[in-house]
Amino acid sequence: MKSVQLCFLFCCWRAICCKSCELTNITITVEKEECRFCISINTTWCAGYCYTRDLVYKDPARPNIQKICTFKELAYETVKVPGCAHQADSLYTYPVATECHCGKCDSDSTDCTVRGLGPSYCSFNEMKE
């Protein structure tokens, strides 16, 4: 009986203390090459923890897939980048996560590297608010 109570308390602690994979507000920096500066945009993305494990013995017959907190559903929003030249396309479309889950990192749509550029990277010197 004591082990059941201990297990129950551990599960309650984990649910309260450990953030699971969920939507969160972030600020990203976007740039248009034609406009030569960056702007900051508030959007929604997925963040949190997913249960994972790294086995000591690697079984080649069973792939070791690490799960990450990633989007399940996306919507796209478009913003007009101010100050672009008249002939330049001043519209920028960016993803907004609407639902999250723990799953395999899809390198076709996500930067799965350990050290990516980060959401505030700008290749130009000038930032506009």
From Swiss-Prot:
Cystine bridges: C21-C69, C35-C84, C38-C122, C46-C100, C50-C102, C105-C112
Keyword Signal: yes
GO cellular component terms listed in the entry, alphabetical order: cytoplasm; extracellular space; follicle-stimulating hormone complex
Signal peptide start and end residues: 1-20
InterPro entries, sorted: Cystine-knot_cytokine, Glyco_hormone_CN, Gonadotropin_bsu, Gonadotropin_bsu_CS
Glycosylation sites recorded in the entry for this protein: N25, N42
Molecular function via GO: follicle-stimulating hormone activity
Subunit (UniProt): Heterodimer. The active follitropin is a heterodimer composed of an alpha chain/CGA shared with other hormones and a unique beta chain/FSHB shown here.
UniProt record similarity statement: Belongs to the glycoprotein hormones subunit beta family.
Function: Together with the alpha chain CGA constitutes follitropin, the follicle-stimulating hormone, and provides its biological specificity to the hormone heterodimer. Binds FSHR, a G protein-coupled receptor, on target cells to activate downstream signaling pathways. Follitropin is involved in follicle development and spermatogenesis in reproductive organs.
UniProt name for this protein: Follitropin subunit beta
Native source organism of the sequence: Ailuropoda melanoleuca
